[in-house]
Design a protein with these regions (language model features):
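Alpha-helix termination/capping residues and helix-transition junctions
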Residues: 9-11, 57, 134-137, 164, ...
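Short helix-terminating capping/connector loops at secondary-structure junctions
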Residues: 38-44, 138, 233-235
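A contiguous active-site-proximal alpha/beta segment in oxidoreductase catalytic domains
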Residues: 85-87, 93-171
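N-terminal glycine-/serine-/threonine-rich beta1-alpha1-beta2 phosphate-ribose binding loop
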Residues: 1-88, 97-112
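Contiguous beta-strand/loop segments that form the cofactor/metal-binding neighborhood of enzyme cores
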Residues: 127, 139, 144-304
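Conserved structured core elements
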Residues: 69, 73, 93-96, 122, ...
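Active-site-proximal beta-strand/loop segments in catalytic clefts of secreted hydrolases
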Residues: 18-21, 50-51, 66-67, 91, ...
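Active-site-proximal cap/loop segments of hydrolase catalytic domains
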Residues: 17, 32-35, 96-99, 107, ...
Length: 304
């Protein structure tokens, strides 16, 4: 899906693609070739199985890292070291230490790194941030953020690895003998996509391969909350996980005293991912395609 965004930028040419599944690189190459031909471009899109080979090319300016999150750190660090700027999908890193190493690589190599937090550009989230910062509901007392459940133990049965997939390379830094191939982790695709084709890898939902909804949706929702309360360049100073000393929900406390609780807040849709800001003069609820406020007059007219 990110290809559409790059394609809309004048002068951008997609020169190469890399994946551990050769079926995916071939399908992507065909899609790029069709698009570039329609624009009168003759840039060839080369295919790679190992990203290190791609990074050796001097004619490539920037890389997108859209792998499972266990590869984000190494791919980003190596891209920076090879002189490439990086657009990395969220969540930025698999662990905190990896994230710090990525920041160091960007700064040491004077590169540009952008993270896929496109939700912040959506009108309803921009409006919510502005409303909070402009005092629409007074002093913020607490925040509820609903992102979903943390990861669960891997419980998928082992299945034969497709011939077109290098599963050892897919695992990469994980190096865990408990992890084995199952199509839910890395869904097979065809060159001629079916209407009901499954593309969403379930690796993100398991402890051994991902960080669950907490990272997948938290990267979006926690980002909005931090931006609204002026903690954009920081993070919580205290985290209490769900179940610790009998706590029902996870909480994050910030240096300014505000506590964000990860729990449902919409009675009619408890599974919805979104945020509720509670102030001493009202509340604001925001999710994708939705915004509400205790004082309807505070909502921008184009969002009512």
């Amino acid at each position: 899906s990110d290809f559409k965004g790059f394609a809309a930028c004048p002068g951008v040419q997609v020169a190469a693609c890399c994946d551990v599944d050769t079926m995916k690189t071939e399908r992507f190459r065909r899609r790029v070739a069709e698009w570039q031909a329609s624009k009168g471009m003759n840039q060839r899109c080369d295919q790679y199985e190992f990203y290190e080979d791609l990074l050796e090319r001097k004619d490539i300016d920037a890389i997108e890292v859209a792998t499972p999150e266990n590869w984000h750190a190494l791919a980003t660090i190596h891209s920076c070291q090879s002189g490439k700027d990086v657009y990395c999908q969220k969540p930025l890193a698999y662990t905190i230490s990896e994230g710090l190493a990525m920041v160091k690589a960007v700064r040491n190599n004077k590169r540009v790194l952008q993270v896929g937090s496109q939700q912040r550009s959506s009108k309803e989230f921009q409006a919510a941030i502005d409303m909070v910062q402009n005092g629409a509901i007074g002093h913020i007392e607490k925040i509820y953020a609903r992102v979903g459940e943390p990861p669960t133990p891997l419980s998928l049965p082992e299945m034969p690895v497709p011939a077109n997939l290098n599963f050892n390379q897919w695992m990469g830094p994980l190096n865990d003998p408990k992890i084995h191939y199952h199509p839910d982790l890395c869904p097979p695709i065809s060159l001629d996509p079916e209407e009901n084709e499954k593309l969403w890898g379930a690796w993100r939902w398991y402890q051994e391969t991902g960080n669950g909804y907490t990272a997948d949706w938290g990267a979006h929702m926690f980002d909005i909350a931090q931006a609204a309360i002026g903690m954009d360049g920081s993070g919580p100073v205290e985290f209490t996980p769900k179940g610790y000393n009998g706590t029902q929900y996870s909480t994050m406390r910030y240096a300014n005293g505000i506590v964000m609780t990860e729990q449902p807040y919409l009675e009619d849709n408890p599974d919805a991912q979104g945020i509720k800001f509670v102030g001493d003069n009202g509340w604001i609820e925001v999710a994708r395609g939705y915004i509400n406020c205790s004082d309807q007059s505070k909502i921008p007219s184009d969002l009512k």
